Amino acid sequence: MSSVFNIEREILPNTYLISFPKFIDERGTFLKIYNEDAFNEIGIKFNYKEEFISKSHKNVIRGMHFQKPPYEHSKIIWCSRGSVIDVLLDIRTGDNYGMVESIILNEDDNYLIFIPTGIAHGFKSLENNSELIYKTSSIYSKAHDEGILWNSFDYDWNNNDKPIISSRDLNHIGFKD
């Protein structure tokens, strides 16, 4: 059984779409989502401290989330059920500040995203019961939890239907504020 993880492309600087091993046989499917040694081999140093599962109805928008120092964290995310549009906003100082990219993740592909510190993260669920799994490199700290208002930066969420957004996410500051 191969344990190959491959960087498929750089989405934003140091933010990677990574393919992971997927094995299918008569019993079903087996996925290897994380292997510290394999990640080190492709140049990604990541030691996770916590893991979360987010289950969402269709048209739910969550984000744009990040944590402030000293609890900032890198993340590995993947979609284990349904499908999502994953949105990444660079909030690091420098030439890439304000860059935004998105990618569709779904349960049938074998991709995950490595998100470094300094990237605000959010997503829109494209199906009922979409499930996103997060591994983070630091423990969640409510006092350091921050966010950017989902519609305050240059990204088209394609909201033909009214999105479902928590009051917490609706009260985040605007990107330019």
Q: What are the language-model segments listed below?
A:
Residues 1-108, 129, 136-177:
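Non-catalytic, conserved peripheral segments adjacent to functional cores
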Residues 105-128:
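Conserved metal-binding segment of the jelly-roll/cupin
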